[in-house]
């Protein structure tokens, strides 16, 4: 596939430096705005915590110069003032601890609330996406939006952002405090800081590139795992285990390499910063001691004075409080960049265009009154198309199942048609079968009828109404679909049947199961209709899963049925059981059948043979056999269906 080739080419490229989209930050702030009051509380608590941290460093200078040094000179020292100062400092510490607890707890609530809202938005938007999106994106990659990308956001919101803000506030507060103590030593730290920032920029810049690459690789690995799990039977049938493992090993190695490189850069940052902090600590002690011994005038925000022992000790403590937040900022920036990469992917999903629907004709319950159709609220078993007109009037057209395609062209890609000039007319109650090799366009036609895709040219009419005028939900509600690949959901058998009509009663579900010949095996399950299915109905045979799928389509009692290769994966005995139920289900309905087994379409009213997106033959079984064309060759085995 083209996207696979593109993926492989991308894998071999050196990752480029990520560009942070300002719009991503703006949209994240939009989610934060809902918690405005709590965010203000968090900011206040972070300020209190940072101030408490700085005051503890300043207290050392006061403790040494104002209390300890004078007490050392007294013959009978009185410690009352020292004890009061220590109690005051203890109170400040308690305030700092409480502030830290409150902002961490509050940020946990905010972050989880935001993530819930983002997941809700993603899931709600995903329901509006066209089938084309899921045909062009691996399920594993879509799933990674809900797992890896949201987890990266969680870490940023609950940990990185608060720590980033706290570190920035601490840096500013400590810097002001250092100016309060000594201008000369502050200037020395600033000079040393330029060297530190150069190291941080080099390491953080490289790690951010590989953190972005890591997120991309995680999506690739998840997508491949999901693909192999779903196709595990095919893998084993064709003995493809070693090849699958080789491909996975390659993708996993690429993930390992990007994670190793990213974390190597990220993990060496703190040790390097710690050692540079130790070097600064020693140098400050030397500079401060030299200034004090030389009697250099100490200049600060409070004026000029002498360099005291308390000032030097306090400055040494502050150097740690200054360097550590800088290291934390650089480290948290990596987490923020990775989270923004995840957020960008999330917003790309949210920005995907929803399925367009400009229809205005709706499907309503109806009844006849004085020979005319009128809308009613109660279920009558009679449905009608409610058609509003520009002059304000309403007309009602009975839902019959009359389907017409006129000169229809279609292509999944622009200027690359896969269907050419398709014309068909299915009268209510007719059974129309499509026959042809894989890729001939059989399934594509049914996808156009229920508007999973829109045609490039021509018209499709449903009961005389152009289907572009019918709301998609109502159009699809009027059709029953049975696919070869059955999807069952976690829940009871009854719930899975009711999926076809959410307001169906238990009696209606059981009647649908009987019609599909599924009632017998369902009652033999441990809890009958209340048996809980898990893992896509993994405990059921393929035939049983297919029967439940047919019952699910039958419960809605639609006038049009689409059977997309519905019995091609069932054994002959089960097919006979299914076919008996299907014959009853198809009675009086317009039915479109796609099957590889020609025996299932032999009794169709019209059989259409497709080749390369064109209808090359049409007619009933007897007519096509008499013509001795492509259908005859397929039926007699001269050619095989693919």
Where do the protein language model's features map onto the residues?
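Helix-loop-helix
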Residues: 177-191, 261, 265-344, 349-353, ...
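Transmembrane helix-loop-helix hairpins at lipid-water interfaces of multipass membrane proteins
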Residues: 2, 39-102, 179-184, 286, ...
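Juxtamembrane helix-loop junctions of ABC transporter transmembrane domains
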Residues: 14-21, 44-45, 52-65, 92-139, ...
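ABC-type nucleotide-binding domain
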Residues: 75, 366-642
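Membrane-integrated ABC transporters
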Residues: 1-53, 68-85, 103-107, 111, ...
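An intracellular "coupling" helix at the cytosolic face of ABC transporter transmembrane type-1 domains
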Residues: 131-132, 148-157, 161, 165, ...
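Hydrophobic alpha-helical transmembrane segments of ABC transporter permease domains
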Residues: 44, 99, 103, 111, ...
